[in-house]
């Protein structure tokens, strides 16, 4: 009977061992499941943190880009304003120079007219006093007066920029070539 007892005890031991093994496997499975859930939670937390960081970086990049855009617009506007001011100053200076040139031309024209009138009067007086002189003398005087009048006319034309370069080249040489 010993063998039957031994067999019974062996079966009993085996049953207990199997039960304990199943309990240990159950505990290991529970712990594995808990570890799995904990790992999933950690992964989700990391994913959420990464998403938040990426969103914050995206927003910061957008803010920086917007600030750069605004700064560029401000700089462009300032450059535009400066250009307009410079152009206006140049326009004003040109108008002043034009006005001064016009006044000088009018003054020169007035003086040329006076000189021409004086020459005409002088010619008239010379002609009257020299009526008795020979025709050659009168012709010579007339040519001189004509030359002086032509010189005054050319000076006025040159002042107004109406001179023909080829015609007046001998009287008013220029450095333009």
UniProtKB/Swiss-Prot annotation:
InterPro entries: LEA1/2/D7/KIN2. Induction: Up-regulated in response to water stress. Keywords: Repeat. Residues 53-96 are annotated as: 4 X 11 AA approximate tandem repeats of T-A-Q-A-A-K-E-K-T-Q-Q. Residues 1-177 are annotated as: Disordered. Belongs to the LEA type 4 family. This is Late embryogenesis abundant protein 1. It comes from Cicer arietinum.
């Amino acid at each position: 009977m010993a063998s039957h007892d031994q067999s019974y005890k062996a079966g009993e031991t085996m049953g207990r061992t199997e039960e304990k093994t199943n309990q240990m496997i159950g505990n290991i499975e529970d712990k594995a499941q808990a570890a799995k859930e904990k790992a999933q939670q950690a992964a989700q937390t990391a994913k959420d943190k990464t998403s938040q960081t990426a969103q914050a970086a995206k927003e910061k990049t957008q803010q920086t880009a917007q600030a750069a855009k605004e700064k560029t617009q401000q700089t462009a506007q300032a450059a535009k304003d400066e250009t307009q001011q410079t152009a206006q100053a140049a326009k004003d200076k040109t108008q002043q120079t034009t006005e001064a040139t016009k006044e000088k031309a009018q003054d020169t024209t007035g003086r040329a007219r006076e000189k021409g009138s004086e020459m005409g009067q002088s010619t008239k007086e010379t002609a009257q006093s020299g009526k008795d002189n020979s025709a050659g003398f009168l012709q010579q005087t007339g040519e001189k007066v004509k030359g002086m009048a032509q010189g005054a006319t050319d000076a006025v034309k040159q002042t107004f920029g109406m001179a023909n370069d080829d015609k007046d080249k001998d009287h008013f040489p220029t450095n333009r070539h």
